[in-house]
């Protein structure tokens, strides 16, 4: 199925809308002390896609793997939102199994598993039976049911559903191919009202770089404390702003947007534009003057910037799987769904153990660890 599997310089990673599979992201992780690995591979279209048995087209693709040390003696290979290449459902497990075995020789000897944080669409998001009478998604089934379906056609039946997803597995994509008025019309009336209210009240959004890092971090600390979130060090965000963005085959355009009112920072966000997609990566806001709707001003500015820079879609990056008020991300769902767009559910994190015994111990230890990180 796969051939010409080889390492490649991460600077040569192919252009992609997936931020976490770019040379830019490799540089971010390298600045933070992680190892990164680029792997190139080829496949025939007929081996990957249903009803393409006569198509001999050769597909060339790649992945970025981040090597994460979990202790002094063991590491894992984490593949954030990769691979981008998404075969037909019946070939996915087989493809990923062969890819795992093909990249095994390139990984450190202490690597005990490969973790794919898949952006592939969830099988159950394509199934009408998994939506209720109101069109609300019921979510993924239990892990055993997921594993049974995912391992279809594999030789080793080796894939395990991770206990939690690291990157968001539910998001909303906005279509930016239409004009600004059409984009606004697709929003909920309350969202349009709040965007216009923030403008009337004098909220202004400006673009900053490293000079805005301290402003961002103060807002971020306030947000983390208010919502009981894990607090990342300022060096994490500094790495995002310092990373090389335009010297590779997969460039990125990073903007730190700050919403202000009368010179007072009220909200901030990181916008990253890669290929045809703008992505809302991180956000923070003050508890003061929330009635001025600065977060709405930020999102509208990010949407307009993305469109102006040639993006055809905008990723809202992370919501609850359904409008369930008891879910910790329900507030994000309610806010982001107001901007219109299509809800997308992905498969999330899947593990391919390289050392079964050590992997079993790792899973036990992971149950008690914090399950949501910036990665």
Give the positions of each predicted feature:
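Active-site/acyl-donor-binding loops of N-acyltransferases
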Residues: 2-14, 22, 43-49, 121, ...
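A conserved beta-strand-loop-helix scaffold within acyl/acetyltransferase catalytic domains
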Residues: 2-73, 120-123, 128, 139-141, ...
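Phosphate-centric recognition/catalysis
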Residues: 79
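Conserved glycine-rich acetyl-CoA-binding loop
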Residues: 85-94, 286-294
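Short secondary-structure subsegments characteristic of cysteine-rich extracellular domains
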Residues: 91-110
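Aromatic (often tryptophan-rich) hydrophobic motifs at membrane interfaces
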Residues: 101, 242-361
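Short acidic/polar active-site loop segments enriched in Thr and Asp
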Residues: 109-112, 312
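Acidic beta-strand-to-loop metal/phosphate-binding motif
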Residues: 111-119
